[in-house]
């Protein structure tokens, strides 16, 4: 059986990498998420993603659901992510209270991908989109 996971090499896992995105990355806001984007120095590498969902969002069930929705979004749209960038998505406090589903997450983050593509050099498939 084939597993459809976001590969480990496309995830940000170390605290130092998260901190670098927070401190030096460009910020983008949506209603439920704060996204930090940091261009990477090594050319030719794929975009990596990381998620941070604090306990302020809700209990473990709620936090895990938000993380699953974010992972699924980035897994399905990884070809459209800006290349050579680290992307950290932080769930805002009220993200757990909202009735988030995949369609709502995609509706919030897809326009953000287009904005990122305009600001980062070497962006991928979204370059030509309005």
Swiss-Prot record:
Root EC class: hydrolase
Catalytic activity: Endonucleolytic cleavage of RNA, removing 5'-extranucleotides from tRNA precursor
Disulfide bond positions: none
Keyword annotations of the record: Endonuclease, Hydrolase, Nuclease, RNA-binding, tRNA processing
Keyword Nucleus: no
Coiled-coil parts of chain: none
GO biological process: tRNA 5'-leader removal
KW tRNA processing (keyword) present: yes
Pfam families hit by this protein: Ribonuclease_P
Entry-linked InterPro entries: Ribosomal_Su5_D2-typ_SF, Ribsml_uS5_D2-typ_fold_subgr, RNase_P, RNase_P_CS
An annotated GO cellular component: ribonuclease P complex
Gene Ontology molecular function, alphabetical: 3'-tRNA processing endoribonuclease activity; ribonuclease P activity; tRNA binding
Enzyme Commission no: 3.1.26.5
Subunit note: Consists of a catalytic RNA component (M1 or rnpB) and a protein subunit.
Family: Belongs to the RnpA family.
Record's function text: RNaseP catalyzes the removal of the 5'-leader sequence from pre-tRNA to produce the mature 5'-terminus. It can also cleave other RNA substrates such as 4.5S RNA. The protein component plays an auxiliary but essential role in vivo by binding to the 5'-leader sequence and broadening the substrate specificity of the ribozyme.
HAMAP family linked: RNase_P
The protein's name in its UniProt record: Ribonuclease P protein component
Organism: Desulfovibrio desulfuricans (strain ATCC 27774 / DSM 6949 / MB)
Taxon lineage: Bacteria, Pseudomonadati, Thermodesulfobacteriota, Desulfovibrionia, Desulfovibrionales
């Amino acid at each position: 059986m084939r597993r459809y996971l976001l590969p480990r090499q496309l995830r940000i896992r170390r605290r130092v990498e998260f901190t670098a995105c927070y401190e030096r990355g460009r910020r983008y806001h949506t209603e439920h998420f704060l996204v930090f984007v940091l261009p990477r120095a090594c050319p030719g590498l794929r975009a990596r993603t990381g998620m941070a969902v604090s306990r302020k969002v809700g209990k473990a069930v709620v936090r895990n659901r938000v993380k699953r929705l974010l992972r699924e979004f980035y897994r399905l749209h990884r070809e459209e992510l800006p290349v050579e960038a680290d992307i950290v998505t932080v769930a805002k406090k009220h993200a757990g209270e909202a009735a988030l589903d995949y369609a709502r997450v995609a509706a919030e983050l897809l326009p953000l991908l287009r904005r990122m593509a305009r600001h980062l050099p070497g962006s991928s498939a979204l370059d030509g989109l309005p």
